[in-house]
Amino acid sequence: MAVRGAVPEVIWARPERTGRGPKPAYTRDDIAAAAVRIADARGLDAVSMRHVAAELGCGTMSLYNYVPRKEDLYELMADAAAAEHVLWEPCGDWRADLMRVARQTRELMHRHPWLPRLMSPVYGFSPHTLRYLEHCLACLEPLAASYGTKLELIAMVNGVVTTYVRNELDSAQRARALPWSEAEEAAVRGAYLARQVASGAYPRMAAAFAEASGPVDLEAVFERALARILDAYEPR
C-alpha cells in the first residue's frame, strides 16, 4: 500500500555504499542476480525480499538496507536483463540493425519469461537500459528523423516484441497444462470451426479460409509485423 507523503526515490541515485562503515556484504548486481535466478526458476511471483534474502544467505530485514522496496528489486532485475543485450557496431542499414535488435529482445524475453511483465516505461532509464537505448539510437543514425521520432519507433518495436512474446509464453504455458495434446485439441477446434464457416453465416470468414494456403507461419508473421512498422517510418 502506498504511503501518502513519502518522497519518491530512484534506486540508481542512491549511493550503493556511503563513505563510512564497513564494505557492504552484497552489491546491487549480487541482489539482482539472486532475484533473476529465482524468477527464472519459479516465476516472477516467487520473487520476494524473503526469498532473495534466503538465496543470498542473509536476513530479510538486512536486505532492505540495500533495496528499500520490492519495486526497486524489480528495477534491478530489469536492468540486469538489459545488461544481456549484445551491443554491436551498427552496419549502416537502420532497418537491418533494428530488426536484429528486435530478434535479440525476443530471445532475451524467452530466456527470462518474467521480463515482459516488467517492460514498463518506469524502468526505462536504468544504467543498462540507457546503454541499450543509446545503442538503438546509434542504429537509427542513418534514418532522417528527429530523436523523438526515433525513440517512438524503438518503443513501438519493443511493444510489438513484448506483445508477441507474451502470447508465445501464454500459449506454451497453456499447452503444458492441457490434459490432451495440442494436435488433438487443434483437430477438434478445427472441425468445429470448419462447420461454422461452412454454415453460410460467415461469408467473409469462409473466403478468408478458402484463400489460406496452410498453417500460419508465426515466424513470418513476427517478421512481417516488424517490417510494416519500419515501413511507416521510412522517409517519404
Task: Please place each PLM-identified region on the residue numbering.
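Helix-turn-helix
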Residues: D30, A34, I38-D72, L76
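N-terminal intrinsically disordered/low-complexity leader segments
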Residues: M1-A25, S199-A212
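Alpha-helical structural segments
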Residues: D30-R37, D72-L87, R100-E107, R131-A138
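Amphipathic C-terminal alpha-helical segment
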Residues: G159-R174, L193-V216, D231-R236
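Short, amphipathic alpha-helical "lid/cap" segments that border enzyme active or binding sites
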Residues: A32, R95, E219-L230
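Hydrophobic alpha-helical bundle segments that form small-molecule/ligand-binding pockets
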Residues: Y132-V188, Y233-R236
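Amphipathic alpha-helical segments used for helix-helix packing
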Residues: A78, R106-H135, R166-R176, P203-A206
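Hydrophobic alpha-helical connector segments
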Residues: V86-R131, Y147-K150, I154-V157
